[in-house]
């Protein structure tokens, strides 16, 4: 069953350029990960420092593989000074 995973984050003020770079790198790595379907980053309309990622996976097991991906962990370590998770990850099942 397909799942959608959401994670809300807050970035350090003034770090939007780095966030765009991080997201581009993450989506590139995810695209090579088995089970990845799609991903998107959306930014808060009321708070410029908040954003959310939504990723779609073929199964929760595929997402767990992504969650434990070494390249992914290395990237988050690299950008840890500008990020804070505020909610998530949350896993949602689809009806399809």
Q: Across the structure, where does each feature detected by a protein language model lie?
A:
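An amphipathic, aromatic/His-enriched active-site/gating alpha helix that lines ligand/cofactor pockets
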Residues: 25-38, 56-90
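Generic alpha-helix initiation/capping and coil-helix boundary signal
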Residues: 23, 34, 46-48
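Flexible, low-complexity linkers/stalks enriched in Thr/Pro that connect modular domains
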Residues: 42, 90-94
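Short, surface-exposed ligand-recognition loops at beta-strand->loop->(often short) alpha-helix junctions
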Residues: 10-20
